[in-house]
From Swiss-Prot:
ATP-binding RNA helicase involved in mitochondrial RNA metabolism. Required for maintenance of mitochondrial DNA. ATP binds at residues 203-210. It holds the Pfam family DEAD. It is an enzyme of class 3 (hydrolase). A motif (Q motif) lies at residues 137-170. Its EC number is 3.6.4.13. Residues 456-628 form the Helicase C-terminal domain. It comes from Aspergillus oryzae (strain ATCC 42149 / RIB 40). Residues 1-40 form a transit peptide. GO terms for molecular function: ATP binding; ATP hydrolysis activity; RNA binding; RNA helicase activity. The gene is mrh4. Residues 51-109, 228-260 are annotated as: Disordered. This is ATP-dependent RNA helicase mrh4, mitochondrial. Residues 190-402 form the Helicase ATP-binding domain.
Length: 628
């Protein structure tokens, strides 16, 4: 029996021959490689360490000990004296286990890792904050002036019976009312570090952040008025004594009179917001408190005429609180540098936008100009991206971080539904699915009890917001909805300023309780409508070609209306597109659930949308956890 002799093969050829893998193995390898997700840029990612004042430096992943530790070294590490114990031995012994805990990936939110742009706050810290603020149940616990405390119930929150401070108000108001240890105006030290106090207010949407910083600011303005009057009295006495001494020495010399110092165009408090819409909203709240507290306020934006801006800012009576956008204020400060010479408090509302690439140079310029007189710098936002978190740790390492337990979480009273537009009867038609959802909501009855005077003044008007990702689609979607008998309007950057104000007023202002005269007029109008006339109009028998959805108003908008706008009358939000990031999810659904009211969000999911992301957002909302 003879054995088959294999042909001789060169060893060099055998080593150079490619290794053939089964097709299934190579396909799995390719799919795993393509499934790797690119890391999101810092401005689109939420920071994981918002509440931490400092972060420990991470260890280098390079092995210092082992069989390959001596390779690629640029320095000769010659062992001289014997070491007591190596780092590896210390790690094995567990002596440093408490100092360097090993991080473990949570199985929750696997799909959201591509959108992890928010900074998570440890739940231990959230629980500690919750227990800390549990004892504060009334605004009487805060050391506010009596006139400021009275304005909360009469002007800021009128018509509410049981008024209690929200978590961010319980945290922020006492801290913002604390004085600096030295009690001096803010200046810059020799090494460049700011001496003024810095605060970061981070809380969920609709939690009352505006009132949380506005009440301490108004209180500070009234206290500074008393302080300035005392300083003026002392200054007048000093000048009078100096004048008497000069007259005694030189009785016949004429001295020019000094012009009186005016506070026109020199505000004490400046509130910066990114958009003109927020200028109008915050300015209304500031002006409402001024009715009882008595201070001078104003708001300026690009929607106003130059004459109106000049008369507001340079009022001869002076101005105490100014609400503006950064670019407009910076342009005014270039020609009128004294505008920023008396600022003691500076607020950056929606700080994640104001510290972004588009606003950062202008915002930094304003901060540097007000630094000589600044006492407190307040940053306020509902989402803290990683880019903002890193910037604050670099520029303001000593900033006081005031974070609420529900930061980066959507309110529990908001329910999220999903509509698959690929199924029947839509077959991928997103416009048709949106119109069908709106008709279903409009024809359904209200789940919440109606207003006590609804039977007198007429039916309740349902307000619905529809968010799109591109502003070009806002007009197209609104036009399609109008063709289906829906009262829809569009709002984007292309809309005029007058139209923006009129539209936002319908979706932000809640109707006050009707007066007896309004009730009588409504009843009279209803009786006239129910009466049978002697002569019918000519077009009475002509049927309408299009069905109309009654008692429903729809606003199709972009992210222009997703940040800071207080849409209290809105109970339904439709996400026409799946948001790009977790930040957009939080801000768009944050238009609901304000002041502990119920809300409903509906997402239209198509073939190319991330259904796993929407699923995990729903799970996080059900558990009441942050979307990180």
């Amino acid at each position: 029996m003879s054995l088959a002799v294999r042909p001789p093969v060169c060893l060099l050829c055998r080593s150079g021959a490619p290794t053939l893998l089964p097709s299934s193995v190579s396909q799995v390898a390719r799919s795993m490689a393509t499934a790797r997700l690119r890391r999101k840029v810092a401005r689109m990612a939420l920071s994981p360490d918002v509440a931490k004042s400092s972060i420990n430096q991470k260890r280098s992943g390079k092995a210092k000990f082992g069989p390959w530790s001596g390779m690629n070294q640029t320095e000769a590490h010659i062992r001289g004296e014997p070491r007591s114990r190596s780092q590896a031995a210390l790690r094995r012994s567990g002596e440093k286990a408490a100092d360097t805990p090993r991080k473990s990936d949570s199985p929750l939110y696997k799909a959201l890792k591509m959108q992890t742009t928010l900074a998570p706050v440890p739940y231990g810290r959230r629980t500690a904050v919750k227990s800390k603020i549990a004892d504060i149940t009334s605004f009487d616990h805060f050391p506010l002036l009596p006139v400021v405390r009275h304005s909360i119930f009469s002007q800021a929150l009128p018509g509410l019976v049981d008024v209690t401070p929200t978590p961010i108000q319980r945290l922020a108001i006492p801290k913002l009312m604390e004085d600096s240890p030295d009690g001096k105006r803010g200046t810059k030290l020799e090494d460049g570090d700011p001496q003024y106090d810095q605060y970061l207010l981070a809380a969920e949407t609709g939690s009352g952040k505006t009132l949380a910083y506005l009440l301490p600011l108004v209180d500070a303005v009234k206290r500074l008025e008393v302080e300035d009057k005392e300083n003026e009295r002392k200054e007048e006495e000093r000048k009078a004594k100096e004048k008497e001494e000069r007259l005694k020495n030189r009785a016949f010399d004429l001295e020019p009179e000094e012009p009186p110092l005016s506070n026109a165009g020199r505000p004490r408090v400046i509130i910066l917001v990114p958009t003109s819409e927020l200028v109008a909203q915050v300015g209304v709240k500031v002006k409402a408190l001024a009715h009882t507290v008595k201070y001078r306020s104003g708001m300026i934006s690009s929607n106003l005429t130059p004459r109106r801006i000049k008369s507001t800012l340079f009022n001869p009576d002076g101005i105490d609180i100014l609400v503006s956008t950064p670019h407009l204020l910076a342009s005014i400060a270039k020609t009128e540098p004294y505008v920023l010479s008396r600022v003691s408090h500076l607020v950056l509302d929606e700080a994640d936008s104001l510290m972004d690439r588009s606003f950062l140079p202008t915002t930094t310029e304003i901060i540097s100009k007000v630094a000589p007189s600044l006492r407190k710098l307040i940053l306020c936002s509902a989402t803290i991206p990683r880019s903002l978190d890193n910037l604050l740790r670099k520029r303001y390492p000593d900033i006081k971080r005031l974070t609420t337990p529900n930061l980066h979480a959507i309110p529990r009273r908001v329910q999220l539904g999903v509509v698959d537009i690929q199924k029947e009867p839509y077959r991928g038609n997103r416009n048709l699915a949106c119109a069908d959802v709106i008709w279903s909501i409009g024809k359904a009855g209200d789940s919440e009890p109606s207003e006590p005077f609804a039977s007198y003044v007429g039916p309740n008007i349902k307000k619905i917001l529809v968010f799109v990702n591109e502003r070009e689609e806002a007009d197209e979607v609104a036009q399609f909805l109008r063709s289906k008998g829906i009262d829809a309007q569009s709002l984007s950057r292309d809309s005029s300023a007058r139209k923006q104000e009129e539209i936002l007023a319908e979706f932000t202002e809640s109707a006050p309780p009707p007066s007896p005269e309004e009730i009588m007029l409504a009843q009279k109008k209803r009786r006239q409508e129910d009466a049978i006339p002697f002569e019918l109009p000519e077009n009475h028998n002509k049927p309408e070609n299009v069905r109309r959805l009654a008692n429903t108003k729809v606003l199709v908008t972009t992210d222009l209306a997703s940040r800071g706008i207080d849409t209290l009358p809105v109970k339904t939000v439709i996400l026409y597109h799946v948001p790009h990031t977790t930040i957009d999810f939080i801000h768009r659904l944050g238009r609901l659930g304000r002041m502990n009211k119920r809300g409903r969000g509906i997402v239209l999911v198509g073939k190319k949308d991330r259904k796993d992301v929407v699923k995990e957002v729903r799970e996080g909302m059900f558990r009441g956890q942050a979307l990180i």
